[in-house]
């Protein structure tokens, strides 16, 4: 496994990446040593990889427990966290245990918060199994669960001791999740690392099928993009807020969809909305909007908000965005990361945020919505969200 050191201010941890490297993952976990390994996963990943990992750890490293949580963003809340904590304690968790977060962004968040809270902090190792997790969420110290009014509103910052990633695990990932993950790569290219746009544009595949070498390049470019803005901002309150590009409208759409729109696909919609806001406000050209639409289309995800998501719910959740408080409070604006051009972020009040007029953002959200269709013409949620360029 190749090793890259993730550095954020005084925080450092290794990111080990390989392909078909489960042996290496088991060996490394054994080297870390634990009184008990607490593998946290959702049912699908538990069936694919969790049981095998538990058995091999038990044989080669020490006692191991597999603890599952209900899948889906809609289940990433305080009740699920409470249930996991109770189960971990019943299974023998102590201060020398390691929480192994085996899964995607939802698992990583809830397991990360679990590790931060058990005994006021025990060791955390991420074993990401999705594109979003491998190239985005495990590169952050943010660990959070959702509240009823919005996404990722209850949490803390907590450092993993390692990330152990095997791209072979992406082969069993549903296509919709691969497409969704690529939207975070598009975000990195547009907001932080425009030098990768041309190669990324040529390599994006709407069918969601990527060879291992392409996936490795994408992951390493994402590591570099994150490093540009978090190397001196571990809490992502300064330059690191650029990583929130597309997340204002994106989180509102994702949360309002009750899990039907995956995270990356929602962020893609949020980026298109942000580009339109910049253009309509006179801060960016129409070409920036076109570039957003072109790159999003090449990922294979939709470019419109599905018609069955109530726009009133989206607008309501915009008011509870997790960036509130960085700019002076106003009932007439939303704090947003906006671009002037690729890689050039608009700045105000000493931050990378702009107070975007609420009326303009609401209008853009309305225009981004898919036109209502007769019920008989509707497909299932997954096809609607990810079936085409919109």
Swiss-Prot record:
UniProt catalytic activity: D-glucose 6-phosphate = 2-deoxy-L-scyllo-inosose + phosphate
Obligatory cofactor(s): NAD(+); Co(2+)
Keyword vocabulary terms for this entry: Antibiotic biosynthesis, Cobalt, Lyase, Metal-binding, NAD
Region (Disordered): 371-390
Record: active site: 142, 244
Binding site for NAD(+): 42, 73-76, 105-109, 129-130, 140-142, 151-152
Signal peptide residue numbers: none
Presence of the UniProt keyword NAD in the record: yes
Pathway(s) of this molecule: Metabolic intermediate biosynthesis; 2-deoxystreptamine biosynthesis; 2-deoxystreptamine from D-glucose 6-phosphate: step 1/4; Antibiotic biosynthesis; kanamycin biosynthesis
One of the GO biological process terms: aromatic amino acid family biosynthetic process
Domain of life: Bacteria
Amino acids binding Co(2+): 184, 247, 263
Name of a matching Pfam family: DHQS_C
Enzyme class: lyase
Keyword Lyase: yes
Family: Belongs to the sugar phosphate cyclases superfamily. DOI synthase family.
Function of the protein: Catalyzes the intramolecular carbocycle formation from D-glucose-6-phosphate to 2-deoxy-scyllo-inosose (DOI).
Protein name stated in the entry: 2-deoxy-scyllo-inosose synthase
Taxonomic lineage: Bacteria, Bacillati, Actinomycetota, Actinomycetes, Kitasatosporales
Gene from which the chain derives: kanC
